[in-house]
């Protein structure tokens, strides 16, 4: 997890961004508090119908196949501008089924709180010891500007997060 404060804070965020965006590999971020006693037994998938989410789920298959419980959450946006980013949760459900991953897939309307905070809350409620998600950047802006959920997860994660781009 990047440093939140101090002279290295900006550098840490820049490095985290570059690693996810440019490595071509999944990246496992571990929170300041470290990983818990387990890793990958209870996995929450933050699903958005995008290349990044699909890549993250595919990259996480070794964890997903061995998990005791998997919960995929597809958050449906409230505002009309975001509707084009949302497609049915059936894509992730079908993929997981084809790979013999027993998962519960929930579609939820975006709550009034930020999506990242909502996902962290659901992860805590579920007892997740790993979150799987796509790493996003905002198109045509500085590579240092991450999407809101990706950035919030890096800053506030309470369990390890596997990100892919």
Regions flagged by a language model, labelled:
Residues 49-101, 106:
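Redox- and metal-dependent alpha/beta enzyme cores, enriched for Fe-S-associated oxidoreductases
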Residues 6-7, 78-83, 110-113, 139-140:
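Short, small-residue-enriched loops and turns at beta-alpha junctions
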Residues 98-131, 136-144, 159:
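Structural beta-alpha unit
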């Amino acid at each position: 997890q990047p440093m939140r404060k101090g002279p290295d804070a900006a550098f840490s965020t820049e490095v985290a961004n570059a690693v996810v965006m440019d490595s071509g590999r999944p990246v496992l971020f571990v929170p300041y508090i470290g990983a818990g006693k387990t890793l990958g037994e209870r996995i929450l998938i933050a699903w958005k119908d995008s290349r990044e989410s699909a890549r993250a789920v595919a990259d996480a298959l070794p964890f997903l196949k061995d998990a005791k419980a998997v919960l995929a959450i597809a958050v449906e946006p409230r505002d009309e501008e975001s509707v084009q980013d949302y497609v049915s949760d059936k894509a992730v459900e079908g993929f997981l089924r084809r790979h013999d991953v027993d998962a519960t897939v929930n579609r939820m309307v975006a709550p009034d709180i930020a999506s990242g905070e909502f996902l962290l809350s659901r992860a805590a409620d579920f007892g997740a010891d790993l979150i799987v998600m796509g790493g996003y950047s905002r198109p045509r802006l500085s590579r240092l500007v991450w999407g809101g959920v990706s950035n919030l997860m890096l800053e506030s994660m309470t369990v390890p997060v596997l990100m892919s781009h």
